[in-house]
Curated annotation (Swiss-Prot):
Primary location recorded for the protein, binned into one broad class: host cell
Polar residues compositional bias, start-end: 646-660
Name of the protein in its database record: DNA polymerase catalytic subunit
Native species: Equine herpesvirus 1 (strain V592) (EHV-1)
Sorted UniProt keywords: DNA replication, DNA-binding, DNA-directed DNA polymerase, Endonuclease, Host nucleus, Hydrolase, Multifunctional enzyme, Nuclease, Nucleotidyltransferase, Transferase, Viral DNA replication
């Protein structure tokens, strides 16, 4: 490695490599260690002493070696501590006392106290950002109250955060017990017991049983989410003191018919033991709430406790004091650690400020080693190396950019121009850290991560790539344990879950104790609708900036080109992190997510990675506890796997209303299919298996649209918060649902309960004065909270307003999760009957609204009786009113005979009248908008113009991000003509009023000539030479690993395999893959054959008996997909026929509403505008014709050709003349 000498600033003569040169104290190979005696087992698992390590470095860094010896990598063993070179100095990576060359916040390292003599550990107020659950075993000679609470083993909940005075703190909370419930009658019958003491003995016997004891000793059956403060003991050490059993009276959550009953409340000293007993003690007995972890118990069982916010330390109930942990007993990298119990904590719910947490924005660059350096690197290949890591460090409190670090394998010189530009922007100069080997680089990065200990980390696609690559590399190649590199020093969670390995996951997950990972790629895909989510496209759209791109294929040559060229890679790497940092502070995702965490009382990591279900579950669990209900246990444990299983169903529910968009269905009200599938499932989540659903679940309902182009005003009424308001208005809940009228004895229909026909079953829900809905209470409180928060925004400071806006947005997200929570068959607490009832009520509301409008406002006189102001809004047309569409929570009403201004003005009064006359509070209609012109295509597909000329569209191809810009441009141009051009709009209205078949034999209205000119322009443009490939790029998401696709003949998969065939950089899962469709050439056919062989879709040639040559087989469009970069670099011709056909197909689907939704007729009529391809007479034939006296025809000019086409379209004879 080259580095700058401290004495004379002269570059070091060469990269140090143990395989080509000797230096003092460095010797390749393995040998004796420096240790002479066995040290005391460390209380940490992060590296503090390394005497030898696996040395892997690229040969291209051997700058003085011949060119033919600079390919591949060196692999061996090096005996010396890991080193880093910075600004001409050499440092021991693991020597904390030497000062180091990166910023450090940690003050306790390797059991030694570096806090200084004047350090004062005292604090009172502290902020919590993460919570970790651990198990701890107390020694027998420890007399403290905390030892008593964890003997022989107990759960400890550690609150990680920062004190008001800026100390990094870890507060260990003891005495939080895991507990669950079992019905006393069921347990007594199964075990032949009658008392609590007998139950304790039975559970101890269960733990002592030979087979189960071994499992308990191995940690099966319990939850371990953080570090460990002590060793684990086997089942043989379980005693009666480990359990506490009480007999309590509760009611199960499911169904109104459930009565209060006696339950055993079984609590255990640790979640591992409690989980083991819950799973293994008489599995046939139904358990309640056994999957709830002790972190959730701490937050829910104590008033106002929060997962993210401020606390104050105080004396306990009986004056007990907190205990300061000595440095030698620290289990985290915090400055101060204390022991306490829940009563030592006082939450401060109204404090919204954040302490000075730190954000690390990082990016890694990798390079393939042996073989083809152009291949994309794989972490488990030891030769595929991490060559650079950029780390930009920010303060979340001030948003200041405080440090820039670049970890580089080999020497790296950042240009002075780049450093000066950083200073000019007010950013720190980059600090370059140079390493001899990849091991040293990675150990240094992990050590920096430990010593700087940022609370938050971000980057772009770090979950799918950067974190995953680092974790796989250090564990598989270097066998480094990562459990000590989070906040905990040992036994902490540091794990990546790859989406490709879990069928249920929608996205990969990263969970690192004490470090919250916020991936800006996920934020961008959720907040933006773009055809590409490459970083350059996102920052271009959001920030108006563009990154300087360095193609992956150029990295090897730059890397081998010396320190200056490696500096270019470094600048590129830093640039990516810098742009992501700007995106982070643009969207501030930590504010919204932390607001969700506070409201749902779950950790930030769970908010980010564990789906919607858990958010509602914890809130319901807390309210149920206050109302003396208990929740049945789910068959899965209460962890990320439970939510992962429900994510797929949540996705299905989100998309269910689009299922029949492209099909023709009968008139009237129709619905979508069963969103949860047809398999049997148990609604009580923990009841007896095999109990199937008794009700078919149908999704959102719609009133069929009156397709066409509407030039009269169309007012749109929306139901405000439809599903939450239905749940509130009709008191829907697990606890208010009755399945049999027997359970309603003594109650009067309509007065005390409502009956709903759902499918072929009657469902009954009691009214609120009989039993109030728990879901309704949650929604009411949340919506009131949101209203109060929004009311504070106008009078708040700008900083407070941002926080409040994120808070109200978080409340909205959770409110909208309630309906989906009940409707997921394999969720945490399913009740499909509630979800089915909600959609049934929504359907009835649409029908009632339609009937009300058609009867109450049927004539002009009736309308003016209801709204006298309507008299002044008459126009020349005869009056009529009609509901032309109903879409789940919206109603479209067309008024003829009223002005647009009048309908707009009357809209609010009309919606209030319908709400008052038809619906219970809080259900209400609101006037959302009024269309001046509306092209209503099919369900959930329309385009229109509202007041002020603003265009609104939904569901049409024009706004789909997978279309290319060429198609979007011309399709949008045609839509603009339809909506904004009076001539075209008038012509379109005439077309709509005539049966579509008639237009086949008659001319289109003359206003359509402008349509024709646009189509001719598009045709001429696509048939012209020198097309810009960028205008024809389409994209599709790689939703899962390619081998997981059933149908592999998809365009973006074809491009994926072509990239693999050419050893290009491969897209990650969830990334959008760009592609174009190319012409079918011989080269395209050859590559299609290779790709089909790679993905196992090759077709066997057809064998015929004759030797006759077979006709050329036309390839599928998917086989003709190609990488746009490859097309540009190699001048591959585009498939212009495909693109123009695609344009025709797109606009035909959009404008089919003009022609009775007949796509074929629409396309045939539009094809009238397309010029015929002229037939070229062969030269020889032309000469013969000329000699015979025929005149040579000259081709038409484009203008003349367009004139003739339009004349043909608009002057078509209605009948052909008869020949004489």
């Amino acid at each position: 490695m080259a580095a700058r000498e401290q004495a004379n600033s002269v570059r070091r003569s060469g990269f140090f490599n143990p395989f080509i040169g000797k230096r003092p104290f460095f010797r390749p190979g393995s040998g004796q260690t420096a240790e002479t005696e066995r040290p005391r087992p460390p209380q940490h698992s992060y590296c503090t002493e390394v005497g030898s390590f696996k040395f892997i470095a690229p040969r291209c860094l051997d700058e003085e070696a011949p060119a033919d010896q600079r390919r591949g990598v060196h692999v061996g063993t090096l005996e010396r501590p890991p080193k880093v070179y910075c600004d001409g100095s050499e440092y021991d990576v693991l020597n904390f006392a030497s000062g180091g060359c990166w910023p450090r916040r940690i003050r306790v390292w390797n059991g030694q106290d570096f806090r200084g003599d004047g350090f004062n550990p005292r604090f009172e107020r502290f902020h919590v950002y993460d919570i970790v659950e651990t198990s701890e075993s107390a020694s027998h000679d420890d007399p403290s109250r905390f030892a008593e609470l964890s003997r022989p083993s107990g759960s400890v909940v550690t609150l990680l955060g920062m004190s008001e005075c800026g100390k990094r703190v870890a507060v260990h909370v003891y005495g939080v017990r895991h507990y669950f419930y079992m019905a006393k009658a069921e347990v007594d019958s199964a075990c032949g017991i009658t008392t609590e003491a007998e139950l304790v003995r039975a559970m101890v016997d269960c733990a002592h049983s030979s087979a189960l004891s071994a499992a308990l000793g191995n940690g099966n059956g319990g939850k371990q989410s953080g570090g460990s403060g002590g060793g684990w003991w086997g089942g043989k050490h379980v005693s009666a003191d480990c359990f506490k059993v009480e007999t309590v009276c509760h009611t199960t959550l499911y169904y109104f018919g459930s009565k209060p009953a006696l339950y055993y409340r079984v609590s255990a000293s640790s979640s591992r033991l409690g989980g083991f007993i819950c799973d293994n003690f008489h599995p046939e007995i139904t358990k309640f709430e056994g999957s709830v972890d002790v972190t959730t118990r701490l937050l829910l069982d104590n008033e106002n406790f929060t997962s993210f916010g401020w606390y104050r330390l105080r004396p306990g109930t009986h004056g007990e004091r907190v205990q300061l942990r000595p440095v030698e007993r620290h289990v985290t990298s915090s400055d101060v650690e204390i022991n306490c119990t829940p009563d030592n904590l006082e939450p401060i719910p109204d404090e919204a400020a954040w302490p000075d947490y730190k954000l690390m924005c990082f990016d890694i660059e990798c390079k393939a080693g042996t073989g083809n350096e152009m291949a994309f690197p794989v972490a488990t290949n030891q030769e595929d190396l991490v060559i650079q890591i950029s780390c930009l460090l920010y303060s979340l409190a001030t948003q200041n950019h405080e440090h820039t670090l670049l970890f580089s394998l080999g020497s790296c010189d950042i240009s002075e121009e780049y450093s000066f530009a950083c200073v000019q922007r007010g950013e720190p100069r980059p600090t370059v850290l140079e390493f001899d080997s990849e091991y040293e680089l990675l150990v240094a990065f992990l050590t920096f991560l430990k010593q700087y200990s940022p609370e938050f980390a971000t980057g772009y696609n770090i979950v799918n790539f950067d974190w995953a690559y680092i974790v796989n590399k250090v564990t598989s190649v270097y066998n480094i344990k990562l459990d000590g590199y989070g906040k905990f020093n040992k036994g902490g969670l540091f794990k990546v879950w790859d989406i490709a390995t879990n069928h249920f996951q929608k996205k990969s997950k990263v969970k690192i104790n004490g470090l919250i990972s916020l991936d800006m790629y996920s934020v961008a895909t959720e907040k933006l609708k773009l055809p590409s989510y490459k970083l350059d496209a996102v920052v271009g759209d959001v920030l108006g900036e563009h990154k300087i791109d360095l193609p992956y294929k150029e990295i090897p040559s730059y890397y081998a080109g010396g320190p200056d060229r490696r500096g270019v890679i470094g600048e590129y790497c830093i640039q990516d992190s810098r742009l992501v940092g700007k995106l982070f502070f643009k969207y501030l995702p930590h504010l919204e997510l932390s607001a969700v965490a506070k409201l749902a009382r779950i950790t930030l990591t769970r908010v980010i990675f564990d789906g919607q279900q858990i958010r509602v579950y914890t809130c319901l669990l807390k309210l149920a506890r206050e109302r003396n209900f208990i929740l049945p246990d789910n068959r899965r444990r209460f962890d990320s796997q439970a939510d992962a299983a429900s994510e797929t169903s949540e996705l299905a529910m989100d998309s269910q209303s689009h299922a029949f968009d492209s099909t023709d269905e009968p008139d009237g009200v129709d619905g979508t299919p069963d969103a949860a599938g047809s398999g049997a499932t148990s609604e009580n989540g923990g009841g007896k298996p095999g109990v199937g659903r008794a009700v078919g679940y149908q999704g959102a309902k719609v009133l069929d649209p009156v397709s066409g182009f509407h030039v009269d005003p169309v007012v749109v009424f929306d139901f405000a918060s439809l599903y939450p308001s239905i749940i509130q208005a009709h008191n829907l809940c697990f606890t208010t649902l009755a399945l049999d009228e027997v359970d309603l004895a003594g109650l009067q229909p309509s007065v005390n309960y409502s009956t709903f026909e759902v499918g072929d079953q009657k469902l009954f829900f009691v009214h609120a004065h009989i039993r109030e809905s728990l879901l309704g209470i949650l929604l009411r409180d949340w919506l009131a909270m949101r209203k109060a928060v929004r009311a504070r925004i106008p009078t708040s400071t700008p900083e407070e307003a941002v926080l409040l806006d994120k808070q109200q947005s978080a409340i909205k997200v959770i409110c909208n999760s309630v309906y989906g929570f009940t409707g997921v068959a394999n969720g945490l607490l399913p009740c499909l009957r509630i979800a089915a009832t909600v959609t049934t009520i929504g359907r009835d509301m649409l029908l009632k609204t339609r009937d009300y409008v058609h009867s109450r406002w049927a004539t002009r006189e009736l309308l003016e009786d209801n709204f006298p102001g309507a008299i002044g809004f008459r126009n020349h047309k005869p009056y009529s009113v009609r509901v032309i569409y109903g879409d789940t929570d919206s109603v479209f009403i067309k008024f003829v005979g009223l002005t647009y201004e009048g309908v707009s003005e009357l809209g609010d009064a009309m919606s209030r009248q319908i709400s008052a006359d038809l619906f219970r509070a809080p259900i209400k209609l609101e006037c959302e908008k009024t269309f001046q012109r509306l092209l209503l295509i099919t369900k959930k597909k329309y385009i229109g113009v509202i007041n002020g000329g603003k265009m609104l569209m939904k569901g049409v191809d024009l706004v789909r991000k997978n279309n290319c810009s060429f198609i979007n441009l011309y399709a949008r141009h045609l839509v603009d003509l339809l909506l904004y051009d009076e001539d075209v709009a008038t012509a379109a209205a005439k077309v709509t009023d005539v049966p579509p078949a008639e237009w086949v034999g008659r001319p289109l209205p003359s206003g359509f000539d402008k349509f024709g000119r646009v189509l001719v322009e598009a045709y001429n443009r696509i048939t012209a030479p020198n097309l810009d490939v960028r205008e024809f790029v389409m994209t599709a998401e790689l939703s899962r690993s390619p081998e997981s696709y059933t149908n592999k003949r998809l365009p973006h998969l074809t491009v994926y395999f072509k990239l693999a065939m050419r050893n290009e950089e491969l897209p990650s899962v969830k990334e959008r893959i760009p592609y174009v469709i190319v012409a079918q050439t011989e080269a395209a056919e050859r590559e299609a054959g290779v790709v089909n062989s790679m993905r196992g879709t090759a077709q066997n040639p057809v064998v015929t008996k004759t030797a006759r040559p077979q006709p050329k087989r036309k390839l599928l469009v998917s086989d003709l997909a190609e990488d746009p970069t490859y097309v540009s670099e190699n001048d591959v011709p585009l498939n212009t026929d495909y693109y123009f056909s695609h344009l025709l197909g797109t606009i035909s689907v959009t404008f089919k509403a003009l022609f009775g939704n007949d796509v074929r007729t629409t396309e045939n009529l539009l094809k009238r505008f397309i010029p015929e391809t002229p037939h070229k007479t062969p030269t020889k034939t032309q000469a013969l014709l000329e000699r015979a006296g025929f005149e040579k025809l000259t081709p038409f000019t484009p203008e003349e050709e367009s004139r003739r086409i339009l004349h043909t379209v608009f002057c078509t004879l209605e009948a052909a003349p008869h020949q004489s």
